[in-house]
């Protein structure tokens, strides 16, 4: 067994400021029971979190949610992060954004804004978002972000209901003069896992979308267009797992709205007691807490991971995915073809070939559905 690697620094801090959100995306990665979570951290508590993380080496902070724009202290949080020396990202739907707030964020020192879209056409975008005004607002704010001197960074979550229009999505991004476009095929955590039958593309859909994306890359390069297209494939069509978060508690630190500290944004669902910043400082949380040490190193591994010569590369894959699909977070990620549970993934691929779940039939991410799920 290789020696346990030294614990890395929490270089990337994800500040999930709130679970409140005006949209209802059925692929949201937030916990299913978000409506039953505790009170949000105050401005001062977030200041303390940011200061402690910065002292430990954190260099980049992402303000996320839910929808972070619902926090009225967002400009204050950005300004404090800037003062502390962070590179600052705002990850937003654009709903709740306006010219005045963009100017405020610019003045506060915000470095980067990413706006998400649900689709390239208004009807599908608004249906998925659960809002009749979402698409027009997103278009307006994408242009406004660019006008204020920010690079235009767009994120499209692709799935079986919009991936066949990947060419239209890319054309929209080109028309908007986007600088970076993330074409992120749905990853199946949170609400997306619940709605997998309505979201997972077929292999043919995925291969076609990737081919078209590559054709557009060649076209953009030939035209001298600097727009960068980033295509993210789903785990379900891989034969080896990803090195999730570059290893458990090794680089990435999430703080949830109520102050729970997690080694990744999906870990809250695990049957592990994670610490809270209301009770402990981040140094204790990162280096000493049970939750952050639970899956570090290799001693926790079972076969086939334990004797696998690839374990130092992929760390056994995603613990959350192992738990969701096998019921035990210590098992190998079933995405891996070496896993005895890989048949779960093969079955999901087969089901995608015949799935008939329409957008309207999916369980949308909203307070009502979350409360029902929380009650069991």
From Swiss-Prot:
GO terms of molecular function: 4 iron, 4 sulfur cluster binding; cyclase activity; iron ion binding; oxidoreductase activity; S-adenosyl-L-methionine binding
Cross-referenced SUPFAM superfamilies: Radical SAM enzymes
SMART domains: Elp3 (SM00729)
One Pfam family hit: SPASM
Stored PANTHER family: PQQA PEPTIDE CYCLASE, RADICAL SAM DOMAIN PROTEIN
Cofactor descriptive note: Binds 1 [4Fe-4S] cluster. The cluster is coordinated with 3 cysteines and an exchangeable S-adenosyl-L-methionine.
Known function: Catalyzes the cross-linking of a glutamate residue and a tyrosine residue in the PqqA protein as part of the biosynthesis of pyrroloquinoline quinone (PQQ).
Gene that encodes the chain: pqqE
Reaction(s) this enzyme catalyzes, per UniProt: [PQQ precursor protein] + S-adenosyl-L-methionine = E-Y cross-linked-[PQQ precursor protein] + 5'-deoxyadenosine + L-methionine + H(+)
Keyword 4Fe-4S tagged: yes
InterPro entries: 4Fe4S-binding_SPASM_dom, Aldolase_TIM, Elp3/MiaA/NifB-like_rSAM, MoaA_NifB_PqqE_Fe-S-bd_CS, PQQ_synth_PqqE_bac, PqqE-like, Radical_SAM_PqqE_MftC-like, rSAM
Domain of life: Bacteria
The EC number(s) this enzyme carries: 1.21.98.4
A GO BP annotation: pyrroloquinoline quinone biosynthetic process
Binding site for [4Fe-4S] cluster: 21, 25, 28
Keywords on record: 4Fe-4S, Iron, Iron-sulfur, Metal-binding, Oxidoreductase, PQQ biosynthesis, S-adenosyl-L-methionine
Subunit structure of this chain's protein: Interacts with PqqD. The interaction is necessary for activity of PqqE.
Segments forming domain Radical SAM core: 7-222
Keyword flag ATP-binding: no
Organism ancestry: Bacteria, Pseudomonadati, Pseudomonadota, Gammaproteobacteria, Pseudomonadales
Protein name as it appears in the record: PqqA peptide cyclase
Cofactor(s) needed: [4Fe-4S] cluster
Functional pathway: Cofactor biosynthesis; pyrroloquinoline quinone biosynthesis
Group of enzyme by EC: oxidoreductase
Family statement drawn from the similarity comment of this UniProt entry: Belongs to the radical SAM superfamily. PqqE family.
């Amino acid at each position: 067994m290789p020696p346990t690697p030294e614990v890395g620094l929490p270089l990337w801090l994800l500040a999930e400021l709130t679970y409140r959100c005006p949209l209802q995306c059925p692929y949201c990665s937030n916990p299913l029971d978000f409506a039953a979570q505790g009170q949000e951290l105050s401005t001062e508590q977030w200041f303390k979190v940011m200061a402690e993380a910065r002292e430990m080496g954190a260099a980049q902070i992402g303000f996320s949610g839910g929808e972070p724009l619902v926090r009225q202290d967002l400009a204050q949080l950005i300004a404090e992060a800037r003062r502390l020396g962070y590179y600052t990202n705002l990850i937003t739907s654009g709903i709740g954004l306006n010219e005045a707030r963009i100017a405020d964020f610019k003045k506060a020192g915000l470095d980067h804004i990413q706006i998400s879209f649900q689709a390239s056409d208004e009807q599908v975008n608004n249906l998925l978002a659960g809002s009749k005004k979402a698409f027009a607002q997103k278009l307006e704010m994408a242009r406004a972000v660019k006008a204020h001197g920010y690079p235009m960074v767009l994120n499209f979550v692709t799935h079986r209901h919009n991936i066949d229009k990947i060419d239209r999505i890319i054309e929209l991004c080109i028309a908007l003069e986007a600088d970076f476009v993330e074409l992120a095929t749905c990853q199946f955590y949170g609400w997306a896992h619940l709605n997998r039958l309505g979201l997972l593309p077929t292999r043919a859909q995925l291969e076609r979308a990737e081919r078209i994306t590559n054709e557009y890359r060649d076209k953009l390069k030939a035209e001298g267009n600097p727009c960068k297209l980033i295509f993210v494939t789903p785990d379900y069509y891989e034969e080896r797992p990803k090195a999730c978060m570059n290893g458990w508690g090794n680089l990435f630190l999430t703080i949830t709205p109520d102050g729970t500290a997690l080694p990744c944004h999906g870990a809250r669902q695990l049957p592990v007691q994670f610490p809270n910043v209301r009770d402990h400082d981040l140094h204790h949380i990162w280096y000493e807490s049970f939750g952050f040490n639970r899956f570090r190193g290799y001693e926790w591994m079972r076969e086939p991971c334990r004797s696998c010569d690839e374990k130092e590369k992929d760390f056994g894959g995603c613990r959350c995915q192992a738990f969701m699909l096998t019921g035990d977070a210590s098992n190998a990620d079933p995405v891996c073809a070496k896993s005895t549970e890989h048949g779960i993934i093969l079955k999901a691929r087969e089901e995608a070939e015949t799935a008939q779940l329409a957008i309207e039939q999916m369980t949308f991410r909203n307070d009502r559905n979350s409360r029902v799920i929380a009650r069991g």
